[in-house]
């Protein structure tokens, strides 16, 4: 018998491919146990084994909120036929990410394993905006033709409002009780609609150029809009009149967002390279103004921490801000998050994952950092050492294709291991600067070297 033929007949052993998965259910179980028995949160010390002590984002709403910064690159996803991605939106329970493309398609991605689930043709033209209702029962999408479509959670379209604007729709927002919604468009006006019957109720006119953004206050009867005429206007939805105008910006206002948790603050970004936060309780007093060398393109508040928000920039970088820690500069920067301009940002409702999309036609998922991560600053999103297939990287272990570096590919050798500490460091000041660590002494090795978790 031919030996080679016998070998060919034997089925070859197949090796499993590891796929990263993010699941917070076990940490929620532990948090409920601690609350039930009146126990305090476990400490997080600078040692790898303390990763198990990281609780869900809800546990760090006020104290140690820096733990919730999504600074670690976890996964990159893209469609086979790649298009620019104007909008992304998490489902209300946070299990799936809905991605809208320039071709008018919806694609669904799993929120824990980041696998592709399905794709469908939703609009005839580019989908420009999407928004779920507060109750999570409906989703509204708008396109470049000025058409609005209303969807059920199973993506069954129940109503279409054809060409309600003469130009493309830029943004949409639900009222706090989901009974009405507002749309804004490049035709210089905003419109308020009754959600039950789809009838137009008010026309908000006052801008002199394209209206690029709108938002409805989470508690009050108040609408904010930002326009290409450099103005930010506040509207009364009952009378349809403008109640206040902010003249702080010198160029197109790209995004205006109320603070979703309490509604006390209003954040806005503009093409004049500035990001400003206003306090509604103090006659719209300017609480923060940050300028940069590149344009701010996208803005999104954290769904858990009331003082934190994230801004996406024209050069593809991500910048995290915390008003309770620093009002003059971002507390953390991911300099090479994308290759091109960031076009959409969305926080998972649970708060443990941040999804971003850009004109490089990819979706990237970011999670919270881990204590003493040896790959912290050696990631290509920080040092820009990107090559073919870099996004598989060391995070996927078996199928790693990125070359190993001195500090980033594996844990430090035994001689330089981080010793365990018995006391919890409560003096968390701020995130360290974005630079690749070069530990030289034992004292320096004890300091934090991971992005987003200064412990």
UniProtKB/Swiss-Prot annotation:
Matching InterPro entries: G-protein_beta_WD-40_rep (IPR020472), Pfs2-like (IPR045245), WD40/YVTN_repeat-like_dom_sf (IPR015943), WD40_repeat_dom_sf (IPR036322), WD40_rpt (IPR001680)
Source superkingdom: Eukaryota
Ranges of Basic and acidic residues composition bias in the record: 432-446
Protein localization: Nucleus
Example of a GO cellular component annotation carried by this entry: mRNA cleavage and polyadenylation specificity factor complex
Residues annotated as transmembrane: none
Region of interest: Disordered: 406-425, 430-455
GO biological process assignments: chromosome segregation; co-transcriptional mRNA 3'-end processing, cleavage and polyadenylation pathway
Pfam families, alphabetized: WD40 (PF00400)
Function: Required for 3'-end cleavage and polyadenylation of pre-mRNAs. Also involved in chromosome segregation where it has a role in chromosome attachment to the mitotic spindle.
Protein name: Polyadenylation factor subunit 2
Species per Swiss-Prot/TrEMBL record: Candida glabrata (strain ATCC 2001 / BCRC 20586 / JCM 3761 / NBRC 0622 / NRRL Y-65 / CBS 138) (Yeast)
Lineage, uppermost ranks: Eukaryota, Fungi, Dikarya, Ascomycota, Saccharomycotina
């Amino acid at each position: 018998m031919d030996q080679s033929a016998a070998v060919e007949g034997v089925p070859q052993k197949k090796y499993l491919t590891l796929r990263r998965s993010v699941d917070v259910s076990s940490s929620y179980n532990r948090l409920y146990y601690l609350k039930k028995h009146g126990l305090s949160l476990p400490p997080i010390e600078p040692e790898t084994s303390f990763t198990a002590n990281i609780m869900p984002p809800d546990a760090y709403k006020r104290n140690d909120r820096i733990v919730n910064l999504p600074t670690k690159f976890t996964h990159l996803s893209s469609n086979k036929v790649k298009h620019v991605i104007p909008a992304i939106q998490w489902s209300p329970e946070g299990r799936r990410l809905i991605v809208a493309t320039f071709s008018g398609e919806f694609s669904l991605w799993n929120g824990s394993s980041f696998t592709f689930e399905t794709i469908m043709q939703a609009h005839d033209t580019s989908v420009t905006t999407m928004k779920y209702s507060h109750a999570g029962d409906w989703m509204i999408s708008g396109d470049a033709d000025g058409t609005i479509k209303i969807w059920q959670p199973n993506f069954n379209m129940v109503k279409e409002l054809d060409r309600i604007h003469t130009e493309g729709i830029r943004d949409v927002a639900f009222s706090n009780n989901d009974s009405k919604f507002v749309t804004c468009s490049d035709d210089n006006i905003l419109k308020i609609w009754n959600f039950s019957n789809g009838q137009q109720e008010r026309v908000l006119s006052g801008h002199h150029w394209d209206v690029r953004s709108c938002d409805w206050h989470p508690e009050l009867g108040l609408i904010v809009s930002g326009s290409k005429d450099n103005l930010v206007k506040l509207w009364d939805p009952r009378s349809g009149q403008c109640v206040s105008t902010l003249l702080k910006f010198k160029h197109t206002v790209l995004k205006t967002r109320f603070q979703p948790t309490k509604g006390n603050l209003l954040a806005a970004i503009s093409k004049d390279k500035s990001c400003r936060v206003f306090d509604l309780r103090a006659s719209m007093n300017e609480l923060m103004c940050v300028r940069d060398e590149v344009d701010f393109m996208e803005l999104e508040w954290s769904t858990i921490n009331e003082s934190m928000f994230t801004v996406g920039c024209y050069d593809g970088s991500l910048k995290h801000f915390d008003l309770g820690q620093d009002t003059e500069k971002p507390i953390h920067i991911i300099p090479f998050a994308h290759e091109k301009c960031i076009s959409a940002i969305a926080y998972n409702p649970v708060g443990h994952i941040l999804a971003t999309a850009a004109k490089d036609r990819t979706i990237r998922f970011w999670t919270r950092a881990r204590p003493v991560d040896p790959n912290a600053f050696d990631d290509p999103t920080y040092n820009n050492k990107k090559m073919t297939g870099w996004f598989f990287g060391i995070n996927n272990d078996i199928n790693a294709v990125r070359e190993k570096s001195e500090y980033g590919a594996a844990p430090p050798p035994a001689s330089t291991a981080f010793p365990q500490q018995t006391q919890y460091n409560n003096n968390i000041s701020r995130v360290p600067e974005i630079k690749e660590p070069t530990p030289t002494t034992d004292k320096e090795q004890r300091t934090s070297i991971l992005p987003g978790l200064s412990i």
